[in-house]
Amino acid sequence: MAAPEAEAQETAFRTTGPPTDSEPRPFPPSSRKFPFESAAADSNEDWAVAAEHYLKGSGENGGWEQPAPGVQPSHPATMASAKTVCDAQPHSMPSCGLPADTQTRATSKLPVKSKEADLLRHLHPGGPEPDVTKVTKSRRENGQVKAAETASRRNLRNSYKPFNKQKPEEELKDKNELLEAVNKQLHQKLTETQGELKDLTQKVELLEKFQDNCLALLESKGLNPGQETLASKQEPTTDHTDSMLLLETLKDELKVFNETAKKQMEELQALKVKLKLKEEESVQFLEQQTLCKDEASDFTIILEEMEQLLEM
C-alpha cells in the first residue's frame, strides 16, 4: 500500500487547459526542486484553482464579467496566471505544448520567475507580492549587500596601508619635538642654577672676610670673644633658674586662688538660695499682713454697726 501512495504524491495533475486523453506522467528522477520553486508551485496551484472557478462561472454566465471601475477582483487569477502555471511545471504537463528547451530551462527559475513576477505586478498592481518576487528580491539584496561589503573592505585595506606607514613617522616627529622642547627647558634651568651658585659663592666669601675682620678688631682691643660667649651662656642659666622658681611659686599661688574662688562661689550660691527663700517669706508675710488689715477693717465696721444698734 505504501508504493501507490508514494506514486500518488510524486505525480502532478493539470488544473487548467482543455482535458486530454494522455495520462499524467510522474516527475523524472533527475528533476530537483528548490525551496522557492516549491513555494512558487504551491502559490501557482492556488491561483490556477481560482482561475478555473472563475472561468467556469464566466462560462455559465455566457461571457466574461466586467468588474466595476473602482472594485478590484477578489481572486487575483487570470489566464496569465494559468500560463505561468504551465511555464512553472513543464515536465508534469506536456499537453501545454511547450518544447523540451523550456523543460530544461525550468531547473534554473531565476530569470523566468522575475519575468513572471513583472507580469503579475503589471496585471495586479494593488495585490500582494507573490513568493517568487520575495525570493528574487531577497537574493538580489543579499548579492548587493555582499558586493558592497567586499568593496568597502577593499577600500579600507587600501586606505589603511599608507595610514599605518605614516603613523609611526608622525609619532616619532612629535616625540622628537617634545624632547627638544624639554632639553631647551633643562638647559635654561641649568644656566639659571649655575648663575645662582656663582652669586652664593661670592656672598659666602664676602661673609668669611667680614668675620675675619671682626675677629681681628676684637683681638686688637684685647677682647676675647670666646670668654664672653661663656659668660653670656652662664648668665642665661641663672636667669632661667630664677624664672623657673618664680613660675612654680606663681602656679602654687594660682592653685590656692582657684580653690578659694571655688569656695567663695559655693558660698555665694548658698547665699543666693537663702535670699530667694527670704524673699518668698517676705512676700508671704506681706500677703498675711494685708489679709490681717482687711480683717481688722471688717471687724471695725462690724463693731461700729453693733454700737449703732445698741444705741438704737
UniProtKB/Swiss-Prot annotation:
Cellular localisation: Nucleus; Chromosome, Centromere, Kinetochore; Cytoplasm, Cytoskeleton, Spindle pole; Cytoplasm, Cytoskeleton, Microtubule organizing center
Residue span of region Interaction with SPAG5: 156-312
Coiled coil regions, renumbered to chain: 166-210, 246-287
Keywords, alphabetical: Cell cycle, Cell division, Centromere, Chromosome, Coiled coil, Cytoplasm, Cytoskeleton, Kinetochore, Microtubule, Mitosis, Nucleus
Record's subunit section: Part of an astrin (SPAG5)-kinastrin (SKAP) complex containing KNSTRN, SPAG5, PLK1, DYNLL1 and SGO2A. Interacts with SPAG5. Directly binds to microtubules, although at relatively low affinity. Interacts with CENPE; this interaction greatly favors microtubule-binding. Interacts with DSN1/MIS13; leading to localization to kinetochores. Interacts with MAPRE1/EB1; leading to localization to the microtubule plus ends. Interacts with PRPF19. Interacts with DYNLL1. Interacts with MAP4.
Protein name: Small kinetochore-associated protein
GO molecular function, one term: protein homodimerization activity
InterPro entries per the UniProt record, alphabetical: SKAP
GO biological process, alphabetically ordered: cell division; cell migration; cellular response to epidermal growth factor stimulus; chromosome segregation; mitotic sister chromatid segregation; regulation of attachment of spindle microtubules to kinetochore; spindle organization
Keyword check for ATP-binding: no
Species of origin: Mus musculus
Primary localisation category: nucleus
